[in-house]
UniProtKB/Swiss-Prot annotation:
Similarity annotation: Belongs to the RTX toxin acyltransferase family.
Protein name in the entry: Leukotoxin-activating lysine-acyltransferase LktC serotype T3
Active site: 22, 91
Coiled-coil portions: none
Substrates-to-products reaction catalysed: a fatty acyl-[ACP] + L-lysyl-[protein] = N(6)-(fatty acyl)-L-lysyl-[protein] + holo-[ACP] + H(+)
Organism of derivation: Mannheimia haemolytica
Lineage: Bacteria, Pseudomonadati, Pseudomonadota, Gammaproteobacteria, Pasteurellales
Superkingdom of source: Bacteria
């Protein structure tokens, strides 16, 4: 990691430490989630008067890497963060109530994209739910159609991965 990125890493780590969900996570997961985002410039950090207020990162995965990520959220290598065109939010940290602002900024930056995330809740840390978000210019119908296609492809890949047999 380049020297000028250490301040950035410190700002993001500070946000993690102030998040009720993230502060319980390991340094290993911090490194897996944050360093590749910085190296690949796949993040957004919001700062107000010099103080970090919100952060998110994303990876553009191919289907194979997506399956790997679903099975183990800490499994992505730095190279895999740019392996395809299936965008996933890896991290979303807004411990001071700036989540809506971060969402607005992401919608502006990526107006035509479908983005998915595994959403974790503080009381259910072992169980995540796949959610999706759409860019600001994408209509709901088109977004739903794209999401459904992604989900069908993912479901098929997961069935094949785990050798599920349909009755």
């Amino acid at each position: 990691m380049k020297g000028n990125n250490f301040n950035l890493l410190g700002n993001i780590t500070w946000l993690w430490m102030n998040s009720s969900l993230h502060k319980e996570w390991s340094c290993k997961l911090l490194a897996c989630n944050v360093i590749p985002a910085i190296e690949n410039e796949q993040y957004m950090l919001l700062v107000d008067n010099g103080i970090p207020i919100a952060y998110c990162s994303w990876a553009d995965l191919n289907l194979e890497t997506e399956v790997k990520y679903i099975k183990d959220i800490s499994s992505l290598t730095s190279d895999e963060w740019q392996s395809g065109d299936r965008r996933w939010i890896i991290d979303w940290v807004a411990p001071f109530g700036h989540s809506q602002l971060l969402y607005k900024k992401m919608c502006q930056k990526y107006p035509d994209m479908i983005v998915r995330a595994i959403r974790f809740y503080p009381k259910q840390k072992e169980l995540g739910k796949i959610t999706y978000f759409k860019g600001g210019k994408l209509d709901k119908k088109t977004a739903k159609e794209r999401f459904d296609i992604y989900q069908e492809e993912l479901a098929t890949a997961l069935k094949n991965e785990f050798n599920f047999i349909e009755k």
